[in-house]
Amino acid sequence: MIDAKEGLFYGKSEKGFGKRQMKNWENVRLVREFSDQGVDCYKLAGGDYVNEYYVVSEAETRKLMNTPEVVGYEVYHCLIPATSQMLFYFKEQKKVTTANILSILRGALNYPLEESCYREHIRVHDISFLSSERVFQEDEIAGLEIKYSKLTMVPDSTLMIGDIIASGETLIHCLRYVTDFYRAHGAKLRNIIIFTIGGTKGIEILEKLTSEIRE
């Protein structure tokens, strides 16, 4: 979870923080945050992170991770219990009140954010959409370009994103696009919550991106 209490993001910016602190993985540990309704949640501690990171485990998420045959709608269905329980936790912790869901097409279709918000009685103010595609020059990838954009500005809301982080380039491009959009309109986000299937690469990307956005 990325906090955003001052400006867009909370706390002081420190150039290069993301790259430097990633050397300290040996100090990182999982601390149990809660165990409820069959969902176990652990918080990453000891890494001196800019953001908050949680690892969630539940029977259906373990099935998803360990069974390559799980595809299509079943992927979406497997993520509902853990996503819903995490949103309940965030609501209890006062970390989310009104949600604005950002759907990064097409990966976001695997994440049950709207349904989970409905189950946990979290108001979804609106859903925004972005589509980012690779730009090629002479048969080589030259960058990314936003091909479709339908953004709704909801000041002081929680921006929720569900996306699988591989290289992270799409997420980086879209997050910069959204934060620039809010800045251009003089608006602020309360925080950003990202649900993802990813590893340490995702944490490194988000730490570095947060520091860059603060500069």
Where would I find each of the regions flagged by the language model?
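PRPP-associated nucleotide enzymes
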Residues: 1-215
